[in-house]
Amino acid sequence: MGYKHKDLLGTRELSKEEILYFLDAAKEFKELNLKDIKKCEYLRGKTTINAFYENSTRTRTSFEIAAKRLGADTINFTASNSSVKKGETLNDTMNNMAAMKTDIIVLRHPSSGAAKFAAARTDASVVNAGDGTNEHPSQALLDLFTLLEYGKSLDKNTTVSIIGDIARSRVARSDIWAMKKFGINVKLFAPKMMIPKDAEVFESEICKNMEEACEGSDVIIMLRIQLERADGDVAFPSSREYSKFFGLNKNRIKLAKPDAIVLHPGPINRGVELNSDVADGTHSVILNQVENGVAVRMAILNTLINNRG
């Protein structure tokens, strides 16, 4: 079936088959990335722009490496050093990028829906690299890729616990939408004010405490607290108190299955949602996630370029 769309805006709109297509395509690029020479010329003569209106380490660097390994010309755009500071709108910025015959725009923006807005107003393909609290599809795809790599099945036999600031996490939303397509059992746990008001749409179990959240899990995804998106509506306890009730430590990880894996989209707040003895321990596959991000994003960029003809 493949993936035949111009843009990649979220996992909620993807079919199970389309998700599997990306995961299968990523295998080729994972193998390439393990070689001494990591480049190919699939995107030779193509131009990608990483348009980031928010700070990023892993996602922007990963997309840049992905594009360059595919042979594309890559430009990094940051809002703080652009005409955005002079009042230029997102619409005008996208139009100008398209006028320069850009093939793909990788967009990160603080406003939910920004990627869809941009995609409707440019001929370039748009990849949503995170729009507000809405979605972050490439992160969800690399998370699923990592699950498969560690022998976790994408079906009802796998239990995934997502713990932390779910209400403000675009990663959580994309992960949940993608996992639900496969019938994966998803459990959620967070402080009450960090559970989404519309959590029932996820059709997931909401746990009462960390012990219940970790019990019998195959995968635990930890999320940081996103105070920058809180708008003053979160009464944040001390880091020590948060860690006591909502942090993952070496005792709580023992409640999960013996071969459970721990994921985190980063950045990690050590000693808050995740203790170092877990982040650096045998259950952690966090750096493997980062590695897999390059392969998955290569698959995304290559697919969208092929769709452009």
Swiss-Prot record:
It comes from the Bacteria. It catalyses: carbamoyl phosphate + L-aspartate = N-carbamoyl-L-aspartate + phosphate + H(+). The keyword Transferase applies. The keyword Repeat does not apply. One of its GO terms (molecular function) is amino acid binding. GO terms for biological process: 'de novo' pyrimidine nucleobase biosynthetic process; 'de novo' UMP biosynthetic process; amino acid metabolic process. Keywords: Pyrimidine biosynthesis, Transferase. Its EC number is 2.1.3.2. Heterododecamer (2C3:3R2) of six catalytic PyrB chains organized as two trimers (C3), and six regulatory PyrI chains organized as three dimers (R2). This is Aspartate carbamoyltransferase catalytic subunit.
